[in-house]
Amino acid sequence: MHRINALKHLALLGALKKPVKISSSEFTRYTSTGSKTAARILKQLEEEGSIDRLIIPEGQMISITEKGHKWLESEFSDYKHIFCGDEDKVELYGNVITGLGEGQYYIAQDGYGSQFEEKLGFKPYPGTLNVRLTSHSADILKRKSQKNIIPISGFTDGQRTFGGCNCYFVEVEGVRGAVVTPERSHYPHDLLEIISPVHLRKTLELNDGDEVKIMIEDRSACE
């Protein structure tokens, strides 16, 4: 318990992003222990590989390692389960495919882009990741009642009319994004077009045919 609490406070001090300077005596303020216990906790975290530590005259430089990062993520998941539940989580699987190349054009339209940024909370990368769901996942999605649909209104730019669409939050292999589904009824139910603040293909090093896991989020439970 002391170790994960210490790791959490190191993260709050910024040790996930860069090394932070702190002495064992200073660290007692965050662990509610004596200086000897605080020093022992830091030594244990270092020995198990959760932190990197460099002793300097003024104290020590500490950074959280990848192992420590994963431990914190696991702890976060536990708390998320406690307070949010996971009955609305749905895992889907599919394969990356090449789209028609229209995603970049539509996302670049101000009428869509401004709504995405306002309603989804991020500015999408100009393009979509296209995923063809497995038949099993497509059936699951078809049966699922979406509780958190975010409508994007249609608009006209003076020359042509752009239809509306619906969005819902997802994570693709842990990277946040949103599925965009046009309102037109003939859109294939097994095809997902996903937008994200990052270039998903590049970030996740995906090629056509690669399988991806898509987690549908229920953000209303935790926000």
Curated annotation (Swiss-Prot):
<feature type="region of interest" description="Unknown">
    <location>
        <begin position="1"/>
        <end position="89"/>
    </location>
</feature>
<comment type="similarity">
    <text>Belongs to the archaeal riboflavin kinase family.</text>
</comment>
<dbReference type="InterPro" id="IPR036390">
    <property type="entry name" value="WH_DNA-bd_sf"/>
</dbReference>
<dbReference type="InterPro" id="IPR036388">
    <property type="entry name" value="WH-like_DNA-bd_sf"/>
</dbReference>
<dbReference type="InterPro" id="IPR023465">
    <property type="entry name" value="Riboflavin_kinase_dom_sf"/>
</dbReference>
<feature type="binding site">
    <location>
        <position position="185"/>
    </location>
    <ligand>
        <name>FMN</name>
    </ligand>
</feature>
<feature type="region of interest" description="Riboflavin kinase">
    <location>
        <begin position="90"/>
        <end position="223"/>
    </location>
</feature>
<comment type="pathway">
    <text>Cofactor biosynthesis; FMN biosynthesis; FMN from riboflavin (CTP route): step 1/1.</text>
</comment>
<feature type="binding site">
    <location>
        <position position="128"/>
    </location>
    <ligand>
        <name>Mg(2+)</name>
    </ligand>
</feature>
<keyword id="KW-0288">FMN</keyword>
<dbReference type="InterPro" id="IPR023602">
    <property type="entry name" value="Riboflavin_kinase_CTP-dep"/>
</dbReference>
<keyword id="KW-0285">Flavoprotein</keyword>
<feature type="binding site">
    <location>
        <position position="130"/>
    </location>
    <ligand>
        <name>Mg(2+)</name>
    </ligand>
</feature>
<dbReference type="InterPro" id="IPR023470">
    <property type="entry name" value="Riboflavin_kinase_archaeal"/>
</dbReference>
<dbReference type="GO" id="GO:0009398">
    <property type="term" value="P:FMN biosynthetic process"/>
</dbReference>
<feature type="binding site">
    <location>
        <begin position="198"/>
        <end position="201"/>
    </location>
    <ligand>
        <name>CDP</name>
    </ligand>
</feature>
<keyword id="KW-0460">Magnesium</keyword>
<feature type="binding site">
    <location>
        <begin position="99"/>
        <end position="104"/>
    </location>
    <ligand>
        <name>CDP</name>
    </ligand>
</feature>
<dbReference type="GO" id="GO:0000287">
    <property type="term" value="F:magnesium ion binding"/>
</dbReference>
<comment type="function">
    <text>Catalyzes the CTP-dependent phosphorylation of riboflavin (vitamin B2) to form flavin mononucleotide (FMN).</text>
</comment>
<dbReference type="Pfam" id="PF01982">
    <property type="entry name" value="CTP-dep_RFKase"/>
</dbReference>
<keyword id="KW-0479">Metal-binding</keyword>
<dbReference type="GO" id="GO:0000166">
    <property type="term" value="F:nucleotide binding"/>
</dbReference>
<feature type="binding site">
    <location>
        <position position="193"/>
    </location>
    <ligand>
        <name>FMN</name>
    </ligand>
</feature>
<keyword id="KW-0418">Kinase</keyword>
<dbReference type="InterPro" id="IPR039063">
    <property type="entry name" value="RibK_CTP-dep"/>
</dbReference>
<keyword id="KW-0547">Nucleotide-binding</keyword>
<protein>
    <recommendedName>
        <fullName>Riboflavin kinase</fullName>
        <ecNumber>2.7.1.161</ecNumber>
    </recommendedName>
</protein>
<dbReference type="GO" id="GO:0009231">
    <property type="term" value="P:riboflavin biosynthetic process"/>
</dbReference>
<dbReference type="GO" id="GO:0008531">
    <property type="term" value="F:riboflavin kinase activity"/>
</dbReference>
<keyword id="KW-0808">Transferase</keyword>
